[in-house]
Amino acid sequence: MTMSTIPESLNSPVSGKSVFMEFGPPSQQMSPSSMTHGHYSMHCLHSSGHPQHDSAYSPAPSFPRSLPYPYVNSVGSHSSSPYLSTVQTYPNNSALAQTRLEDPAPESEKNTVVEGGEVRFNGKGKKIRKPRTIYSSLQLQALNRRFQQTQYLALPERAELAASLGLTQTQVKIWFQNKRSKFKKLMKQGGGTIDTNALANGRGLSTGSPSVAPVWNTTATVKTSTPTSYIPSYTSWYPTAHQDTMQQPQLM
């Protein structure tokens, strides 16, 4: 009798609950809902020997089927787990990820450095051409007069000239560099002779060589002389040819 009563007491619902509490982790506090699900999972293991308790522990249709391990069900009661927190905050992080993708564009603009009139990105050698500076006639005359005096300017002279003309020092420096390069080309082409007046007015840099003007004068004289010699010859030929054609039918 004593041996038969011991298994019955172990198979009772109260004894199953006490066994579940003994084998569960001591530090983990469980809610009543998790305890009921845990007891149901323990009862599923012994349901083959006691079919009469299946109706009392039938699962509700709104709850999913619990796993046989009790500590798995306790995860749902604890919202402070790292996995659940990351899952809950994942939709909120989509806006942050989108803003992070849009951040590199302003950062590349901040890293632009202007060095000597050249724009460089992140210190690399990529250059972007700036629009050309349009000088007025008064500025060009002053720059040409100063270039006739000296081809190289010191820093104080360049600063003074730029301030007087309303230009930057970089613009004055670039203009003098271009002027010197063109002047050297003209010296090579013209054999070292350039009119000083044309250089002061800036005309010597626009023409290819000083010998171009006489060529234009010769072509102009040829064009004016050819029509005078061509028109009388044509008028003298036309009446004779017309008279010959008129006389031939009369002879026939």
From Swiss-Prot:
It is found in: Nucleus. InterPro entries: Distal-less_Homeobox_TF, HD, HD_metazoa, Homeobox_CS, Homeodomain-like_sf, HTH_motif. Its main location: nucleus. Residues 128-187 bind DNA. The gene is dlx1a. Belongs to the distal-less homeobox family. GO terms for molecular function: DNA-binding transcription factor activity, RNA polymerase II-specific; RNA polymerase II cis-regulatory region sequence-specific DNA binding. This is Homeobox protein Dlx1a. Keywords: Developmental protein, DNA-binding, Homeobox, Nucleus. One of its GO terms (biological process) is cartilage development. Transmembrane segments: none annotated. CDD domains: homeodomain. It holds the Pfam family Homeodomain. One of its GO terms (cellular component) is nucleus.
